[in-house]
Amino acid sequence: MSSKDQLKRAVCETIDRHADTIIDLGETILRHPETGFNEVKTAALVADQMRALGLAPRTGLALTGVKGRLAGGAPGPRLAFIGELDSLRTSEHPLADPVTGAAHSCGHNAQIAGMLGAAIGLTKAGIAGHLAGDIVFFAVPAEEFIDVEERAARVAKGEIEFMLGKPELVAKGHFDDIDMSMMIHTGSRDAAEARAFLAKSSNGALVKRIRFLGRAAHAGSLPQLGVNALNAAMIAMNAISAQRETFWEKDTIRIHPIITKGGDAVSVVPAEVTMETFVRGGSLEAIVDANKKVDRCLRAGAMAIGAEVEIHTIPGYLPQRNDERLGQIFGANVETLFGPGQFHIGGHRTGSTDMGDLAHLMPVIHPYVVAAEGKAHGADWRINEPRHGYLTPAKLLAMTAIDLLHGDAAPAKEILAQFNPAMTKEAYLEFQRSLFRTERFAYIEEEARRPKIG
């Protein structure tokens, strides 16, 4: 049997020989961004690549997910390499879709290229026979929680149950045959000076859709007869801001509402105003506590103006916890490629990912390869080191898989034996479903009081 080091050299050399193909995959996806649950072209590209590698992909999972499998030479743990199919909406990005405003301003195109690059390296270098266990290549939809109204409509039609890709895939049973998962995100030099890094944890989040309802009236002649739903929303937002000093620093609470509809016409008192917000925090307890305060503020805005408020609470992301032992194995491979000091383990990050949901069920890691410049989710975000951004994730995924599954897969088995899931799948789904809630609070009078004449 070949040694781990020999296999790693072989897979990295194979990835380098196919560098142009892997980079072109990443750049092609970059030029054709698609939002969550709409990633039809991207999914088709992934499926075609998997078929060419003999991975017999399953398609249409949670609408657009694609899943292929490389069987090892012996039974063993089942390791998933995950890549996220979706883009954001960043209409000012130079490569944004001119119709939809979609843009890969978070680097998910590099995730898919890296996942497929690892598949190319492992299959063409003939690595599988040296491994005990399977490698699952899983392109998943809808990591970015955007287009809430569109996704709510999909839920109402029964097309999906959850509005994020990984929770939906868990509910449909598509992670039942996976024991541990990893993916590699693109990071920018603003986040770390090393070539790659791993945060210990990140925030979870609840999602809120809010509707304030008032009464329309002529905004110039008779505003007294209207009930201004926009004013109710603004009072609620100011009340949320006033809560910030009540949050504990250790809970890393982040609340960032936007107005998605502010009224119908400038000459009409706004009768319907809609908002969306995340309620983020470092623990479930912190999120639940902050959410109660947000709900009070929303009700207060409606009460102050005499309006109505409709509050939809939606499960979002669970807090992320990276597996320490998996992270150590990954980090050792980073330093093999780039030298000592080029892998950094950081603290807590205040963004969110639905890898946090998987982390409650199985060992996962969600590291970053630093290959971009600009602001994540911004118009200036771009991968400025294409070879590093697309090829390094492919190599690191493959190298880590060899470490985990080589021989009798002892490292993977040890990690699984030591892992205590925070929830069973059944408890996870029960908890997620319990978070869906719609409440309506009416403070509006039947008819606005008219002034006496004479």
Give the label of every model feature segment.
Residues 3-105, 109-136, 141:
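Acidic/His- and Gly-rich active-site-bordering loop/insert found
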Residues 83-88, 187, 203-205, 260-263, ...:
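Short glycine-enriched loops at secondary-structure junctions
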Residues 29, 68, 81, 108, ...:
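Divalent metal-coordination and catalytic microenvironments
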Residues 84-93, 142-144, 211-216, 274, ...:
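Short connector loops/turns at beta-strand edges and beta->alpha or beta->beta junctions
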Residues 93-105, 109-110, 122-256, 263-268, ...:
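Histidine/acidic-residue-rich, glycine-tolerant segments that coordinate divalent metal ions
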Residues 2-6, 230-454:
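Metal-dependent amide/peptide-bond hydrolase catalytic core
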